[in-house]
Amino acid sequence: MVSAIYSIKAAQHHNPVPNAAILRGLLVTSGILGKRLESDDYPVDKGEQTALVFSYLEVILDEAGATPQDVIKLDLYFADKADRALANEHWLRLWPDPAHRPARQAHQAALPDGCCLQIVAMAVLPQG
C-alpha cells in the first residue's frame, strides 16, 4: 500500500495531492514548486524560487529518511529552458561528484503563472 508524505515544511498543492508517495522503497515526489510557505506565492526572483524548489526537495527526502544521494532521477520542468543555469547551481551543490549524479531530464512546460520551475524526483530509500 502506498504511503503518502504531506510536509508542513514544503509548499502544498491546492489539489488533494501529497508531496510524495512511497511504495516498496521507491519514493516519487509530486511536482515540487517554489512557492513561499508563508504567502503561498512565487517569488519574482527566479533564483529565490529555484532555491526554494531544491530546499523543498531536501525537506521531502529528509522526511522520507532519504538523502540527495538516494535520488536516481530528477525531471525539471521549466517555463523557459534558458533558466537551466539557475538549477545547475543547486544540482552541483547536491551532486558535486559526476560519478554519483542521478539521471536528469529537462522539459519545457506550461507552468502556473509566476512559476519558473517544477521538479519531480524519484529516489530509492535506504535499507534498514
PLM region spans:
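N-terminal presequence-like segments and the immediate start of the first folded domain
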Residues: 1-55, 59-72, 78-128
